[in-house]
Regions:
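Feature 14080 marks short, conserved micro-sites in well-ordered regions
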Residues: 1-255
């Protein structure tokens, strides 16, 4: 469920349209299907579903991911009307080997400092950090934190996750291929200003790969950002940051 412009939006299946986007004003009469993005039935007679997901309000509109059957799972926008609910950007244009549209899988949608950030895979850079100003032209890759391809020719992924706004900047976890899994990154909204904040778990594991601190559960409290992490010394414990490398430290070794 998400509130946007005084109405409640959610995904539901009414038995006639599949799992689609619904809207409610809080009354029985005002609770209804907003739009069926993927109409029709499959070969078994079941309704197709667009599966709206990852909903967030941004600039008084609703943004979400869905699959309309033509573009794959991509980024959509709605102004609260059926006519105004449409594809915002098809980030992964090519089809797979079976002729079906590839999905970019937009995820982790969050507003920060007047922009919409999310993760997606455009088929070129792997799963990376994207940004949008709410327009098709202004929806683009922000930073490829792990460039290059693997031995099979597939793009490396940095897998940005745990996106959160703090003090006007975006904080998130990622693996840049150098510092390990789920270290803490920060972005000021520019490519140059998107970078590692701190590598909490230094060194390599027995396979020669960088240790990861596996940061999770980022939440702002009393003007600081708290999270869980494993620095390789204390185990998985509570950490805090004031947004600087020097101000990122262990709060308590509880066990």
């Amino acid at each position: 469920f998400i509130e946007c412009n005084g109405k409640l939006y959610f995904r539901a299946n009414d038995g006639e349209t599949g799992r689609e986007l619904f809207v409610s004003d809080g009354t029985a009469e005002g609770t209804q299907l907003l739009v069926d993005l993927l109409p029709g039935k499959d070969n078994y007679g079941d309704n197709y579903s667009s599966f709206p997901d990852n909903m967030v309000e941004f600039n008084e509109k609703l943004y979400f991911s869905a699959n309309n059957g033509e573009t794959g799972r991509e980024l959509f926008v709605s102004d609260g009307t059926a006519e105004g609910t449409q594809l915002l950007a098809d980030l992964r244009l090519e089809d797979d080997n079976y002729g079906y549209s590839h999905d970019s899988y937009p995820d982790n949608l969050v507003e920060c400092n007047g922009k919409l950030y999310f993760t997606a895979d455009d088929g070129v850079h792997g799963n990376e950090l994207f940004v949008s100003d709410g327009t098709t032209e202004g929806t683009q890759l922000l930073a490829d934190l792990r460039p290059g391809d693997d031995n099979y020719g597939y793009s490396y992924d940095s897998y940005p996750d745990n996106l959160v706004e703090y003090n006007g900047k975006l904080y998130f976890t990622a693996d840049d291929g150098v510092h390990g899994n789920d270290e803490l990154f920060v972005s000021d909204g520019t490519t140059e200003g998107t970078q590692l904040l701190v590598d909490l778990c230094l060194g390599d594991n027995i396979y020669g790969d960088s240790n990861g601190s596996f940061i999770r559960n980022l939440v702002e409290f009393n003007g600081k950002l708290y999270f869980t992490a494993d620095d390789g010394v204390h185990g998985n414990e509570l950490f805090v940051t004031d947004g600087t490398t020097e101000g990122t430290q262990l709060v308590a070794d509880i066990r």
